[in-house]
Amino acid sequence: IKCPKCHRTDRQNRVGKTPSGSQRYICMHCLKKYTPNPKPWAYPKEVRQKALQLYVDGMNLRRIARHLGLHHRTVSLWVKAQAAQLPDPPVPEQVKEAEMDEVFTFIGQKNQIFIITIVDCLIRCYLGCKVVLQRTQEAIQEMVDEAPKAKRYYSDAFDAYDRLWYHGGRYEVSQGKTDTYSVEADNAELRHYLARLGRRSRCFSRCPEALKAALKLFMYCFNRRQLYKQAFPNYPAHVYQFV
């Protein structure tokens, strides 16, 4: 045993253990306390990958923590960290028709918040998303500006959509659900795969940042799956496989 400060090897006495069980020592020359062989605090990469896959596949944070023997806060931090390092979700090179709609959920003390989405009709990839407290024209316009440009846009009869600039694309109001079935289906996927969006559920987001991180992680994996299915239609693929 060698002191990391004065580099002496004599008079190195034991002085208890760390919470993880590693033996600690004290150098009687310089009074430096140290742990020669500390145990790693980080979980294995396989455990982290498994937790993220379970989250994308529909399990909530606390249930994942119970199954893997973790703390739910650890899983939450992993989701945020993974979302922060991901690029924007991949999208098709060309978009002919796009559909827009919104999903409402709760945040904090059951306050209502909206998730506005724009979806490609053909491949059903998410082209853009906004998390807002109010469905304002400015927020929806920003989403349209950032998304890939389409030739046709469809939505329900919410009046804000009719006042947007679509960069030369043609806008039409859907008659019933006939022209918005793709975005309705993708929004249903959000509620199916993200436990925090389940209806009549006790699982809801505490802050907008957590909701945005969950949406980015899921949409990234979902879009990759959709593009994979377009390229290889005969091979089955699940969303969790693209984490």
Task: Report each predicted region and the residues it spans.
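Residue-level recognition of single "structural anchor" positions
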Residues: 1-243
